[in-house]
Swiss-Prot record:
It catalyses: 2 a phenolic donor + H2O2 = 2 a phenolic radical donor + 2 H2O. Its EC number is 1.11.1.7. Induction: Late induced by benzothiadiazol, a chemical analog of salicylic acid. Enhanced expression following incompatible bacterial pathogen attack. Binds 1 heme b (iron(II)-protoporphyrin IX) group per subunit. Binds 2 calcium ions per subunit. Belongs to the peroxidase family. Classical plant (class III) peroxidase subfamily. It comes from Arabidopsis thaliana. This is Peroxidase 20. The gene is PER20.
């Protein structure tokens, strides 16, 4: 696995070379090695504590990756997702896509505590999220990439935005495409970032609609997933009734502990767990998405390269830089 990761890393050198800096909304750049002088051990502190957290709870890797996704899709990559409800401001944590679903806040809290001890008011919570996502992917066998740093933290959260912009597990393909386009992301980004579902788990409430047999008289196409009756029965036994809505099943049934390309192999076999996974193939009437899914299924290196490119794009959505926002002392609250 280490050899494979090194091979992909070498394939990404050209990509890194052209992304050593990215401008924020007001012209201040995100940079490689942003904390080299102000907090030289920042990236090492994050890396070490992500390693500890994932060793203790392997599922935490997917949870931390998901945290950055849910942050960037609401207001931008500004750590607004980490803010608790305070006064008149409702936390994004309470929004429907996040409630009883997002995890890993305590890991970010502890890393922030250590960074404040080492370098007070220097490393932003939004940069911690970006580094944590990268390190989590790498720890599960995925690619490594240079995270450009220098983000600052927002002064507000958007409960309404979290309900509006975070894709639902039962999203149609059209709604996913529109949702990603609103963030400046294209169809290739949608496919590549969906590959993050190669790790992690989902609750029964998120996918039990996929288990119920359709009324074939009202169905214009056969959901490939439903042809796998054994797969369906196994999942159905976990989600018999509403009392089991919080039971968990791996998003990738084949290699749930590894960040690899099996998610795309599963899609081609009709074994995507969520509706929003399956529609990448079942609702792609033109075949463009199916072709890319097939390419990723047979070429893991290509998936890794495109995934990194899309993560870099996502990590730069509406970032705050320069004098915008602040560096929070505590990721859960704006500074007083």
């Amino acid at each position: 696995m280490e050899i494979k990761q090194k091979k992909v890393w070498l394939s990404l050198i050209v990509l890194y070379a052209i992304t050593t800096s990215v401008l924020g909304d007001f012209g201040e750049p995100l940079l490689k090695g942003f904390y080299k002088e102000s907090c030289p051990l920042a990236e090492e502190i994050v890396k070490h504590n992500i390693e500890v957290a994932v060793l203790k709870d392997p599922r935490m890797a997917a949870s931390l990756l998901r945290l950055q996704f849910h942050d960037c899709f609401v207001l931008g990559c500004d750590a607004s997702v980490l803010l608790d409800t305070h006064g008149d401001m409702l936390s994004e944590k309470q929004a429907t896509p996040n409630l009883n679903s997002l995890r890993g806040f305590e890991v970010i809290d502890y890393i922030k505590y250590l960074l404040e001890e080492a370098c007070p008011l220097t490393v932003s919570c939004s940069d911690i999220l970006a580094l944590a996502a990268r390190d989590s992917v790498f720890l599960r066998g995925g690619p490594w990439w240079e995270v450009l740093l220098g983000r600052r933290d927002s002064l507000k959260a958007s409960f309404a935005g979290a309900n509006q912009f975070i894709p639902a597990p039962n999203s149609s393909l059209d709604s996913l495409i529109i949702n990603f386009k609103q963030q400046g992301l294209n169809i290739q980004d949608l496919i590549a970032l969906s590959g993050a579902h190669t790790i992690g788990k989902a609750r029964c409430v998120s996918f039990k609609q996929r288990i119920v047999q359709p009324n074939m008289e009202q169905t214009f196409y056969v959901d490939e997933f439903r042809r796998h009756s054994t797969f369906r029965r196994v999942l159905g036994s976990q989600c018999k009734d509403s009392s089991r809505d919080n039971e968990l099943s791996p998003l990738d049934i084949k290699t749930p502990a590894y960040f690899d390309n099996h998610y795309f192999i599963n899609l081609l076999e009709g074994r995507g767990l969520l509706i929003s996974d399956n529609v990448l193939v079942s609702e792609d009437h033109e075949g463009e998405i199916f072709q890319k899914v097939w390419e990723y299924a047979v070429n893991q290196d290509l998936f890794f390269i495109d995934f990194v490119e899309s993560m870099l794009k996502m990590g730069n959505i509406n970032v705050l830089t320069g004098i915008e926002g602040e560096i929070r002392e505590n990721c859960r609250f704006v500074n007083i």
